[in-house]
Regions:
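Active-site-adjacent beta-strand/loop module that shapes the phosphate/pyrophosphate-binding cleft
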Residues: 78-108
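Conserved Nudix-box catalytic region and its N-terminal flanking loop in Nudix hydrolases
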Residues: 2, 13-66, 70
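A structural signal for well-ordered alpha-helical scaffolds and beta->alpha junctions
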Residues: 56, 60, 87, 125-129
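Short loop segments at secondary-structure junctions
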Residues: 13-15, 97-103, 118-120
Length: 141
């Protein structure tokens, strides 16, 4: 059994290398929040029933549309993939980089979201903090 995929959005400033994550009112994943009982699965942990994997392009398109952005405004980070154990099954989580020079503040604001530094995420649930840590490591590599 597989749960719907989620996407974390990050913006890395090209000139200053400042890293910001897009935080929605419900947390850091889009298009919908993780369930309260969600737990981050270990890296390399086997996911049952994942013989067929859905390509994340539709997820990127849906999130871009939700934010009023173009699909080209979000680039998938190929080096990142995580899974979160939920009551519905394992939910794949991808990392998308916002490609604009500056973060799309207006698009974020229209969605009720805001850009935060990783240090401003201390109040997130443990699963989301773990996802942020892995995403940050991926972006810094």
């Amino acid at each position: 059994m597989s749960a719907p995929a989620r996407l974390i959005l990050v913006h890395k400033q090209r000139t200053s290398a400042m890293i910001r994550f897009l935080r929605f009112p419900h947390g850091i994943v889009a298009p919908e929040p993780l369930p309260k009982l969600a737990e981050l699965m270990g890296e390399g942990e086997q996911v049952e029933g994942e013989a067929v994997v859905t390509h994340p392009a539709m997820l990127v398109k849906n999130v871009a549309t939700m934010l009023g952005l173009s699909e080209d405004d979000i680039a998938l980070e190929g080096g990142f993939r995580a899974h979160v154990d939920t009551p519905e099954g394992a939910a794949p989580v991808y990392l998308g980089s916002l490609t604009a020079i500056d973060p799309p503040y207006d698009a974020a604001e229209c969605s009720g979201a805001r850009f935060i530094a990783i240090t401003d995420a201390r109040d997130l649930p443990p699963a989301e903090l773990g996802l942020l840590r892995r995403a940050y490591e991926c972006v810094m590599e």
